[in-house]
């Protein structure tokens, strides 16, 4: 089931989503980014990073409306990060707004978090587990299940606050439907994976859009009830929030909080390598935990402001809540259909990328992958292609361009706006009898050519096409086109050596002139003769004169 969708028309092939995806679960095909669902951990980083808004979180507002329309009461479990998302709004105000949308009521997910905290405290008190990793974050759970299964024994088999609160609501209001609203994309997947507790998941962005659609404004109200002291678990959406809600009574355990996928991955590697002692680890995929979630409204006030809002809304006590018979949940290994290619295949791909030597592996990351070898593996797995390598494309384009420039029979010269030579090909150097490229590179063009035409093109903005010029200093005739590219601040000259053509034309003109001179003599001599025998030859002589005169005119025209 797709939780992240692509808006194909928006994707511009910038690879930013790959750069930000911690597990590289993105496949590029036909110039479009596609999520590889069985590899994705639903962290939402590609959604946040995409500058073109080409990634979309599945919208479930329609499903929530259907639940309301069914006539069965629908209760909302609202994530404690709502106070960071909706500035100055408490649970009472939000409850009023949600009722206007048709919900039966809204209660805090932090109530379910109370049961989760109690389960974590029991695990620590038992002391049977060397390492305990919190299991509230579904993205962290998925990361471990797919990529670090060796750490599964350390992952607490405890329901998340969302699942626990969904069950609490269904116990309090038998037969009701439940909708969770929070800042997290992966909660949609968790609700589907553990069906029964939560019937629908909305993000804060979805809720905000729905409220605007219905012209419902969330107005601050007096919230004395909402500020009850029984609310320590409202701290959950901040880094160390779980730890701050716990009684840390076992001195044998070290308590630590880790946020951000990369930090979590590093910690998991340390755990698997046996470098970690007895500890309880709170893990959150999002930097700053849930208040840094991908589906928080984009109008963030800043982490300090949001952290303060959560702290001020929280209390130091505990919720009085309904007890659940079973707080455990299964977190099995998730197998992925992913094959690792052999070293020979990787070397072959690197060779095709013009990286036959390790020194050629720049590891620049422009393709989105951290190393060239990682990119080669992705190509072999069908997730990437050669054209995603910027240095490769640049080298290929330059090679192609150089081949064209250096093998064309036309002379090509590129000047800066200061009329200094930036590039000149072999054909142009031959035209101007220049032995070495270094003799002219960076030099003023006035050293080799009259700059008047180049200055004219720059001042008028009008290009010159096929202008015939005699380069007296080189004894060459050229047909020159001069183009001024303002966007790149260059002047380009394309010269065609027409010296051979001019020499041939001069020979033809000379031959024509000689033929005309001979014709004139013939005509003159003929006319003297016809004066003597005009009466005998008559019309025939006149016709001869006309023919010769016409020949002369034709030759003259050819000369012109």
Predicted ranges, named:
Residues 510-560:
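Signal-transducing coiled-coil/dimerization helices and immediately adjacent hinge/linker segments
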């Amino acid at each position: 089931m797709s939780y992240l969708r692509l808006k194909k028309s928006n994707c511009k092939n910038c690879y930013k989503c790959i750069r930000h995806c911690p597990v590289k679960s993105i496949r590029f095909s036909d110039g479009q980014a596609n999520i590889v669902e069985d590899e994705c951990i639903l962290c939402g980083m590609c959604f946040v990073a995409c500058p073109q808004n080409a990634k979309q979180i599945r919208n479930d507002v329609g499903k929530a409306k259907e639940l309301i329309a069914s006539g069965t009461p629908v209760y909302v479990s609202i994530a404690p990060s709502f106070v960071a998302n909706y500035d100055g709004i408490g649970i009472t105000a939000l409850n009023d707004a949600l009722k206007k949308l048709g919900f039966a009521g809204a209660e805090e997910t932090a109530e379910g978090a109370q049961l989760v905290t109690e389960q974590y405290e029991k695990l620590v008190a038992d002391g049977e587990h060397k390492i305990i990793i919190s299991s509230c974050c579904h993205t962290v759970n998925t990361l471990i299940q797919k990529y670090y299964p060796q750490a599964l024994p350390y992952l607490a088999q405890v329901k998340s606050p969302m699942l626990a609160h969904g069950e609490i609501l269904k116990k309090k209001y038998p037969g009701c439907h439940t909708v969770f609203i929070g800042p997290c994309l992966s909660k949609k997947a968790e609700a589907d994976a553990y069906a029964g507790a939560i019937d629908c998941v909305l993000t804060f962005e979805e809720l905000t859009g729905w409220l605007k659609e219905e012209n419902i404004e969330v107005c601050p109200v007096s919230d004395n009830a909402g500020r009850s002291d029984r609310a320590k678990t409202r701290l959950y959406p901040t880094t160390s929030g779980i730890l701050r809600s716990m009684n840390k009574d076992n001195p044998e355990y070290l308590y630590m909080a880790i946020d951000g996928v990369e930090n979590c991955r590093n910690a998991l590697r340390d755990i698997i390598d046996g470098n970690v002692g007895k500890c309880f680890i709170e893990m959150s995929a999002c930097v700053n935990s849930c208040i840094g979630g991908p589906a928080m409204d984009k109008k963030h006030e800043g982490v300090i402001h949001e952290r303060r809002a959560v702290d001020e809304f929280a209390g130091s006590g505990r919720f009085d809540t309904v007890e659940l018979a079973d707080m455990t949940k299964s977190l099995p290994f998730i197998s992925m259909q992913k094959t690792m290619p052999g070293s020979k295949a990787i070397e072959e791909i690197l060779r095709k990328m013009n990286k036959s030597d390790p020194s050629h592996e720049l590891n620049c990351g422009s393709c989105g992958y951290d190393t060239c070898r990682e990119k080669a593996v992705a190509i072999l797995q069908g997730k990437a292609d050669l054209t995603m390598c910027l240095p490769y494309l640049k080298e290929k384009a330059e090679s192609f361009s150089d081949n064209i420039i250096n093998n064309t029979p036309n002379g090509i010269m590129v000047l800066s706006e200061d009329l200094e030579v930036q590039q000149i090909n072999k054909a142009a150097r031959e035209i101007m009898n220049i032995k070495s490229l270094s003799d002219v590179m960076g030099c003023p063009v006035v050293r080799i050519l009259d700059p008047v035409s180049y200055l004219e093109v720059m001042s008028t903005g009008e290009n010159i096409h096929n202008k015939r010029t005699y380069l007296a200093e080189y004894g060459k005739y050229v047909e020159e086109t001069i183009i001024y590219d303002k966007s790149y601040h260059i002047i380009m000259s394309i010269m065609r050596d027409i010296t051979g053509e001019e020499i041939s034309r001069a020979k033809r003109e000379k031959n024509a002139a000689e033929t005309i001179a001979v014709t004139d003599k013939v005509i003159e001599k003929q006319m003297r003769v016809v004066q003597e025998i005009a009466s005998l030859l008559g019309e025939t002589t006149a016709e001869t004169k006309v023919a010769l005169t016409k020949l002369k005119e034709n030759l003259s025209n050819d000369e012109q």
